[in-house]
Amino acid sequence: NLFFYINFVMGKINSIYAASMSIINNDLTLDVTKTIQHAEMIIDQGCHGAAIFGSTGQAQLISITEKIKLFNQLSTSKYKDKYIIGTGLNSLSETINLMSVARSLNFKKFLIMPPAFYKYEDDNVINFYTKIIEAHPECEIVLYNFEKLCGYKFSVECVQELVKRFPEQIVGVKDSSYNLFENLEIDNFSILPGSESKLLKGLELGCSGIITATCNVTSALARKVYDDFFDKKEQSANQKLCNVRNAFEKYNLISGLHAYYSKTNGIYKNVLPPLSILNS
């Protein structure tokens, strides 16, 4: 039945998630309050939740001190249970320490990409996540598969081995390299493509939803496609959803999203160097 399908085929995180944006002050510090308000807004608009400090949130460019400040305030958000925390760090030690802060505030779900810059193989990646889980056995990790950013692409076999070793901790994958969502089948494991254009096809294949940058804009449309799929309604919004995604993909997604929002609210005009906002 549908209940069995959702809970045992689709996985633990069955949702439309936005990779939420970070709001930057004129002096290039993080505006913690407005960053949280933005995440709450896109949840109000239709997302089930938001990933904080993913690549869209400029995670690799924001200081650890500012991240900790945001975690403390985020722990009082009305949507506290709807957030996945991105670490956005190369250092294993700093990743573990940042997770310690988040865990002390009762955050449990984390989006973690393997380190960038260095060449390594599946066994090395398994060791990296093993060290994290040994330090935080109570955490739930969504793997971040994005070869374009970190230089490593998860294989089906690597994900299967991680889930086999850590079925309670490795709960899903954000697939932005798109080599997994059509080929990976693991019970009680969430596969979340990184694009709205993969949402409907992914759901048809048993995927759990999406985590995407452009859900900062498409939250209502993406939620409608998701809900209509499970309500067995005709898909009236999917083409428009894909069109919006395709329009943003012509540009750097972070620059495009900040340019889009800054047209109506000047707080979005700042991004951290070396990024820049789109011109007119």
Where are these regions (language model features)?
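Short, Lys/Arg-enriched N-terminal segments with co-localized hydrophobic residues
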Residues: 1-9
